[in-house]
Swiss-Prot record:
Its EC number is 7.1.2.2. Its main location: membrane. Produces ATP from ADP in the presence of a proton gradient across the membrane. The alpha chain is a regulatory subunit. It is found in: Cell inner membrane. The gene is atpA. This is ATP synthase subunit alpha. Belongs to the ATPase alpha/beta chains family. It comes from Bartonella tribocorum (strain CIP 105476 / IBS 506).
Length: 511
């Protein structure tokens, strides 16, 4: 066999020329100890706070405590397969989630992975979950109504686009039902050819620490009523680890910010933030952070304020988009003065206070009109609603005051008796069954009838029947009247005369 040295050197030179060295450099550390969803890791010297790390079994974690000799990592998953001495790799990215229209109609976990069995998500972009809220300059004051379809709220405690309105009450008082009805009320604007893009509101529901059956029921109702197509469900259920329950609201908020920053409107319900605070407390105590009041860490206020400040109404230069937040807080025995409730009340622009007593008396939604408030007020109402709802607040306040005194004496003068009668009927008028939100113009006509004395001669038990009959009549014969109120957004003298004529005829024939 003849080997030519010149050929060998030529081949070697070619191979050296084509040699491509690929070196993948990644910083790694080792698990010192693991337990209760927390891993102590040695060796990740350059890791950032909030950075994702990967464990050998594919489970992700987030670096939270950066200490001198180790890093405290919270684990987004089960810690059963993680052992002491396991290798942990930095991923170089802060926690992010998929966002965009591809998520509409889907149920995802706290990290944005689909859990509804409908296959992978289509094209999406990714956003960090924990970003800074918009500053003062890009914002605009809240001035557009966010209609919930509930008379008691739209008339007395109006919510505007970009507002943060707290829904607070004991367990089983209908907090989630208010969120659900508000979602369902956005449906008419999403029907084909119905609304303009600026009328559409995309809905995000974040379930934190709830039973899976409850979340499944919520999704089922949305699906049956055609509201899932414009909604995103983010679920971190009771069986999920605390870090996922902690991050779920931040992930849902990032998904809502996509719509806000693209000039669209989104509504997000956090159900509920008490459980997020509990999850955060658990993580903080296990990370050995010093406890404060009720054993919550010192920055639990900051946790909620930085989340809720991300809800905003942006000005025209920034696209005029909005993100409205409806955080839910569960109280214990109506104690609104506990730590977390007072924190969230001070952060939000008002609260809807639901009471067990009212709920069991059959007043549903069980809104305590005296304690509930919207700090945006009538700026978030159309003029027509202001015209009719202005007097109902005063009348109900007087009614509550008088009702307390009326228990002690029976000999009441005629004006007091009239006030009590009117108040009882207005309270009855504000009741509303679940899953039956009303359009704003329908609410205006119904409340107009209430404040102008059309209910005064009826028995309290007939008020609901009177209202139903009136709505049927308006929808069938007076669609033009409703249309005129919706378009003009105010009750002109001409419309008022028409309304009075319709109501006089209806009241005369009602029996």
């Amino acid at each position: 066999m003849d080997i030519r040295p010149s050929e060998i050197s030529k081949i070697l030179k070619e191979q050296i020329k084509n040699f491509d060295q690929k070196a993948e450099v990644s910083e790694i550390g080792w698990v010192l100890s693991v337990g209760d969803g927390i891993a102590r890791v040695y060796g990740l010297d350059n890791v950032q706070a909030g950075e994702m790390v990967a464990f050998p079994n594919g489970v992700r974690g987030m670096a939270l405590n950066l200490e001198v000799d180790n890093v405290g990592v919270v684990i987004f998953g089960s810690d059963r397969d993680i052992r002491e001495g396991d290798c942990v790799k930095r991923l170089g990215a802060i926690v992010d989630v998929p966002v965009g229209p591809a998520l509409l109609g889907r149920v995802v976990d706290a990290l944005g992975n689909p859990i509804d069995g409908k296959g992978p998500l289509k094209e999406t972009e990714r956003r960090r979950v924990d970003v800074k809220a918009p500053g003062i300059i890009p914002r605009q004051s809240v001035h557009e109504p966010m209609s919930t379809g509930l008379k008691a709220i739209d008339a007395l405690i109006p919510i505007g686009r970009g507002q943060r309105e707290l829904v607070i009450g004991d367990r089983q008082t209908g907090k989630t039902a208010i969120l659900l009805d508000t979602f369902l009320n956005q449906k008419p604007f999403h029907e084909k050819g119905a609304g303009r893009e600026q009328d559409k509101v995309y809905c995000i529901y974040v379930a934190i620490g709830q039973k899976r059956s409850t979340v499944a029921q919520f999704v089922k109702v949305l699906e049956e009523r055609g509201a899932l197509e414009y909604s995103i469900i983010v679920a971190a259920t009771a069986s999920d680890p605390a870090p996922l329950q902690f991050i779920a609201p931040l992930a849902g908020c990032a998904m809502g910010e996509y719509f806000r920053d693209n000039g669209q409107h989104a509504l997000i319900g956090y159900d509920d933030l008490s459980k997020q605070a509990v999850a955060y407390r658990q993580m903080s105590l296990l990370l050995r952070r010093p406890p404060g009041r009720e054993a919550y860490p010192g920055d639990v206020f900051y946790l909620h304020s930085r989340l809720l400040e991300r809800a905003a109404k942006l000005n025209a230069e920034n696209g005029s988009g909005s993100l409205t937040a409806l955080p839910v807080i569960e109280t214990q025995a109506n104690d609104v003065s506990a730590y977390i409730p007072t924190n969230v009340i001070s952060i939000t622009d008002g609260q809807i206070f639901l009471e067990t007593n009212l709920f069991y008396q059959g007043i549903r939604p069980a809104v305590n009109v005296g304690l509930s408030v919207s700090r945006v007020g009538s700026a978030a109402q159309i003029k027509a609603m202001k015209q009719v709802a202005g007097s109902i607040k005063g009348e109900l306040a007087q009614y509550r005051e008088m009702a307390a005194f009326a228990q002690f004496g029976s000999d009441l003068d005629a004006s007091t008796q009239r006030l009590l009668n009117r108040g009882a009927r207005l309270t009855e008028l504000l009741k509303q069954p679940q899953f039956s939100p009303l359009k704003t113009e329908e609410q205006v006509v119904v409340i107009f009838a209430g404040v102008n004395g059309y209910l005064d001669s009826l028995a309290v038990s007939d008020v609901a029947r009177f209202e139903q009959g009136l709505l049927v009549l308006l929808r069938s014969d007076y669609q033009d009247l409703l249309q005129a109120i919706a378009e003009q957004k105010q009750i002109t003298d001409e419309l008022k005369d028409k309304l009075i004529t319709v109501l006089n005829t209806y009241a005369k024939n009602f029996s």
